[in-house]
């Protein structure tokens, strides 16, 4: 892709679009999505200037004004962002800046324009269900709503599988099972893992087995009327939507999600 330049510096918009496309080609859709979100936020700040803003315009002074804009809720148009959200936008912008500089062998200042930006993010409190709530879930009568039922079974599976992350469960196939163990590669780290299949897990797996269907949880890959392409993220949103309703009906003190079950 040929990048247009202004004063010998490439346009930031085109650099970032190229970077996002490369991540999609590499199969790193989640990273591409993070980059897209960070760029969309910066584009909103730039407004009409976005078409002429160059790589070298990303200075320390500019970034301080951008951060202030984010902290003030886009000049009062939105609610002020929490530290975690501020960190997300700045961190991904910094990653893109460094990646573009490396790939295009750009001349950059000795001191990074991001060096003075420090966002203190408070540690995330681990969310977990109390043991009594877990016992109630395990003995809960099968929900009449089929989508709520599959969401409950999936949540219990995450718990029995020692906190396996949703993306890895989404990708599980029956070919991953061997000698009462599930063998898989953790998507986040690339590390090979194995999990002993408990009797509870075996019952859940068996109940969703479909002839000539490779997926352990085929319902996660089924397209729902009115929804777009099924991805791990869209399936996760669907499952969490039903879990949250279930948690409200059971009067849980916190929102009931797959994240909560993984850390219980």
Q: At which residue positions do the language-model features occur?
A:
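N-terminal core-binding DNA-recognition domain of tyrosine recombinases/integrases
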Residues: 17-30, 40-125, 140-143
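DNA breakage-rejoining catalytic core of tyrosine-based enzymes
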Residues: 56, 120-139, 191-198, 213-216
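Short, charged phosphate-coordinating catalytic segments
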Residues: 98-107, 158-179
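C-terminal catalytic core of Y-nucleophile DNA break-rejoin enzymes
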Residues: 189-207, 214-245
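Short, basic/aromatic-rich helical patch in the C-terminal catalytic core of site-specific tyrosine
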Residues: 63, 93, 169, 258-264
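N-terminal helical hairpins
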Residues: 1-10
């Amino acid at each position: 892709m040929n990048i247009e330049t202004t004063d010998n510096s490439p346009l930031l918009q085109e650099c970032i679009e190229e970077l996002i496309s490369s991540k999609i080609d590499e199969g790193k859709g989640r990273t591409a999505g993070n980059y897209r979100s960070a760029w969309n936020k910066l584009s909103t700040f730039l407004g009409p200037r976005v078409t002429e803003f160059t790589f070298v315009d990303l200075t320390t002074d500019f970034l301080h004004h951008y951060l202030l804009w984010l902290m003030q809720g886009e000049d009062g148009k939105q609610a002020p962002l929490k530290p975690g959200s501020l960190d997300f936008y700045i961190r991904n912008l910094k990653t893109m800046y460094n990646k573009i500089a490396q790939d295009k062998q750009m001349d950059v200042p000795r001191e990074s324009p991001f060096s003075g930006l420090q966002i203190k993010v408070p540690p995330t409190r681990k969310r977990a269900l109390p043991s009594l709530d877990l016992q109630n879930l395990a003995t809960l009568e099968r929900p009449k709503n089929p989508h709520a039922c599959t969401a409950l079974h999936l949540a219990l599976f995450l718990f029995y599988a020692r906190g396996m992350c949703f993306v890895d469960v989404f990708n599980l196939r029956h070919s991953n099972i061997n000698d009462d163990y599930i063998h898989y590669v953790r998507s986040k780290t690339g590390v090979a893992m194995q999990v002993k299949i408990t009797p509870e897990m075996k019952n859940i797996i068996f109940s969703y087995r479909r002839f000539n269907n490779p997926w352990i949880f085929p319902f996660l890959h089924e397209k729902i009327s009115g929804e777009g392409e099924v991805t791990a993220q869209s399936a996760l949103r669907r499952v969490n939507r039903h879990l949250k309703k279930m948690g409200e009906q059971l009067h849980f003190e916190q929102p009931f999600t797959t994240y909560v079950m993984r850390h219980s």
